[in-house]
Amino acid sequence: MEPKYQRILIKLSGEALAGEKGVGIDIPTVQAIAKEIAEVHVSGVQIALVIGGGNLWRGEPAADAGMDRVQADYTGMLGTVMNALVMADSLQHYGVDTRVQTAIPMQNVAEPYIRGRALRHLEKNRIVVFGAGIGSPYFSTDTTAALRAAEIEADAILMAKNGVDGVYNADPKKDANAVKFDELTHGEVIKRGLKIMDATASTLSMDNDIDLVVFNMNEAGNIQRVVFGEHIGTTVSNKVCD
């Protein structure tokens, strides 16, 4: 069976690395995620990763508490680098050649982000983990995921959610009548104000015709199911739904 997507970017929340603790980095949890990614990688799919930093730091609440927003955001970017290094180590543990590239140069721990080098790594079947956001404050890691996916010409962004199995018209944890969407267009997401990604990230994905698949990462095997075209979660694309 052939994969539906040949090159993907997986977007993980920082909280996904925290496990049941909710904060920090839980190594067994990271290793479990890395194992799933490694199993997909064996099929020949080219994989890049963007990981948030919310398990270690959140810039907006810090700014609300009085910290300078720019400094708060830079602090968060460093958190994403920590997550990237830990994930890369876990992927190496499963025999996957992995590189970390950061938008802020820190040559002693990672490569600087260079698009051509990232593409070469992917073509050589290495996984690339992008850290430090886009290197500028005020931009989320969702926007980083959309931008890097466009730059590496990814077929899809896999938005791996913590315990959420797709996109709903209301919060399913608060509304028992919430309805899940199987398919949406990027335009519908923006028009309805659905909080999948921020508006900048949604617009980037729409303008560059990149599919977005939102699914529950807590169910083992779901990454592989998405890559091979099984209909789980919610698919967002530019195709008009029937």
From Swiss-Prot:
GO terms for molecular function: ATP binding; UMP kinase activity. Pfam families: AA_kinase (PF00696). Its EC number is 2.7.4.22. It catalyses: UMP + ATP = UDP + ADP. Homohexamer. Pathway: Pyrimidine metabolism; CTP biosynthesis via de novo pathway; UDP from UMP (UMPK route): step 1/1. It is found in: Cytoplasm. Residues 19-24 are annotated as: Involved in allosteric activation by GTP. This is Uridylate kinase. NCBIfam families: pyrH_bact.
